[in-house]
A protein has these predicted regions:
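A glycine-rich (often HGG/GG-containing) alpha/beta subdomain
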Residues: 1-146, 150, 154, 327, ...
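C-terminal-of-GTPase-core extension/linker across diverse P-loop GTPases
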Residues: 2-9, 145-265, 282-284, 300, ...
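Glycine-rich, N-terminal phosphate-binding loop of Rossmann-like dinucleotide-binding domains
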Residues: 23, 90, 241, 276, ...
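Switch I (G2) and immediately adjacent beta-strands of P-loop GTPase domains
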Residues: 53-65, 69-73, 254-282, 300
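Conserved beta-strand segments of alpha/beta enzyme cores
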Residues: 108, 270-272, 359
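Short, Asp-centered acidic motifs that coordinate Mg2+ and/or phosphate
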Residues: 271, 303, 334
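Generic enzyme active-site microenvironment
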Residues: 273, 307, 336
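Inter-motif core of Ras-like GTPase G domains
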Residues: 287-311
């Protein structure tokens, strides 16, 4: 248990109501020094857990605010420690004044993520659940919210615990075999049964590893590259999709040189739009670097919006098809015929030599015509599965790397069983697999890794 008591503001600035959280062995006593219940002959320490007490915060004889204080006793609190939460008016002055009074009476300011770190250290959650708290706070779509809730409620942890139990059973059979190797008549499990067990474990770990492809896209946004020649309307479309003037719009060719990225939620899915430099022949060194980055971002995209100026569509398609189509293999490509308001009887057909999965749409980004239709096409093109809170999908790079290491270890186990190698080597690989799975839950994680994880939380 930690021996000091911490405090921090737990709510965002600017609201009508603010909350200060206090946690540690002296949380109730320190709060009592500055808080007087409205009810006479009553102390905060006499309150039952999970109750609210109305009263006033005092600085000496001066009333700072009328507040509500909730009380939690260890181990039945978020951190597993004695805790109080002071709900006051949201004035920045009041919040800072209450913090100063708490610190004056024995608290210290909490470090970023320290409340959740204490919850982890006190066994209230494992490390993967603690990381899910940060993901929940940062969630910006229904899908990211559901995945964070699933992980925070222990869905991922239960999957890992089941795998560890199976691996421990596995290694116990191997080591029993080693302990009684002098008694050839004893057989605890034949190699075919062990192979089947290893195969079952490998399938589960491989499924979790493969789920990262979807999880990473859901968490960070479906990458959508907006490409095309200069002045095709790429920046205008980006501004319309983001509903803000993010990119500079100009009639001058080559205005966009730096890559501009931003995310927006469309239909419960986060899309990460990338406005790129217009592709053209140029002698400008800086513009050439921007075009080079355009192709790099194109390679990273899941969906490609090829902006085509409808007033000169055929020439642009002929000019860029050879450069773009090979790079768009395996991606969702949408031909966006822009500036439809300037052309009569526009042709938005897909050329015969284009792949079958290419889609097309006619719109006017400047006049915001047919933008909703494009948004529907983006949702369909994302090909994301429907996410529920029961789904176990990996979204964290640290988890992905640990699972990859575990998968490599179980592959060595399978190879060892197939080649009938000594149980000593097989047992070692099984234990390595267990180690990597335990690393995800924080059972073997070192202090430097913990510090790196929790320092990315907000204070409070």
């Amino acid at each position: 248990m930690n021996q000091d008591t911490i405090c921090a503001i737990a709510t965002a600035q600017g609201g009508a109501i603010g909350c200060i959280r206090v946690s540690g062995p002296e949380a109730i006593e320190i709060t009592s020094y500055i808080f007087t219940p409205a009810a006479t002959n009553r102390e905060l320490g006499d309150s039952k857990p999970y109750t609210l007490t109305f009263g006033r915060i005092y600085d000496g004889s001066e009333v700072i605010d009328e507040v509500l204080v909730s009380l939690f006793r260890a181990p039945h609190s978020y951190t597993g420690e004695n805790s109080t939460e002071i709900t006051c008016h949201g004035s920045a002055y009041i919040l800072q004044k209450v913090l100063q009074l708490l610190i004056k009476n024995g608290c210290r300011m909490a470090a970023p993520g320290e409340y959740t770190q204490r919850a982890f250290l006190n066994g209230k959650m494992d490390l993967s659940q603690a990381e899910a708290v940060a993901d929940l706070i940062a969630s910006s779509s229904a899908a990211t919210h559901r995945l964070a809730m699933s992980q925070m409620r222990g869905g991922f942890s239960k999957e890992l615990a089941t795998l560890r139990d199976q691996l421990l059973h596995f290694t116990s059979l191997i080591e029993l075999e080693l302990d009684f190797s002098d008694h050839e008549e004893l057989e605890f499990a034949d190699r075919s049964e062990l192979c089947q067990l290893a195969n079952n474990i490998e399938k589960v770990i491989a499924r979790l590893v493969n789920s990262f492809n979807v999880g990473n896209v859901i968490k960070n946004g479906v990458p959508v590259a907006i490409i095309g020649e200069t002045n095709a309307g790429k920046s205008t479309l980006l501004n319309v999709l983001l509903n803000e003037d993010k990119a500079i719009v100009s009639d001058i060719h080559g205005t966009t040189r730096d890559i501009i990225e931003d995310t927006v939620n469309i239909g419960g899915i986060t899309f990460r739009f990338i406005d790129t430099a217009g592709i053209r022949e140029t002698s400008d060194t800086i513009e050439s670097l921007g075009i080079e980055r355009t192709f790099q971002k194109l390679d990273q995209a899941e969906i490609v919006l090829w902006m085509i100026d409808a007033t000169n569509a055929q020439a642009q398609i002929t000019q860029l098809a050879g450069q773009l189509l090979p790079r768009c293999e395996g991606k969702q490509l949408i031909l966006v015929y822009n500036k439809a308001d300037l052309v009569d009887n526009i042709q938005n057909s897909i050329p015969d030599n284009f792949p079958d999965n290419v889609q097309s749409i006619t719109l006017s980004a400047k006049k915001r015509e047919h933008i909703e239709e494009l948004q529907r096409m983006l949702i369909t093109s994302a090909h994301l599965p429907t996410i529920t809170q029961n789904d176990v999908i990996v979204t964290n790079v640290r988890h992905y790397e640990a699972l990859n290491n575990a998968l490599e270890a179980i592959h060595r186990v399978q190879e060892g069983l197939t080649n009938n190698i000594s149980g000593d080597f097989i047992s070692q690989d099984i234990r390595e697999c267990i180690f990597h799975l335990s690393d995800i839950a924080g059972e073997v994680t070192n202090d430097m890794v913990l510090q790196n994880i929790f320092q990315h939380f907000c204070i409070g």
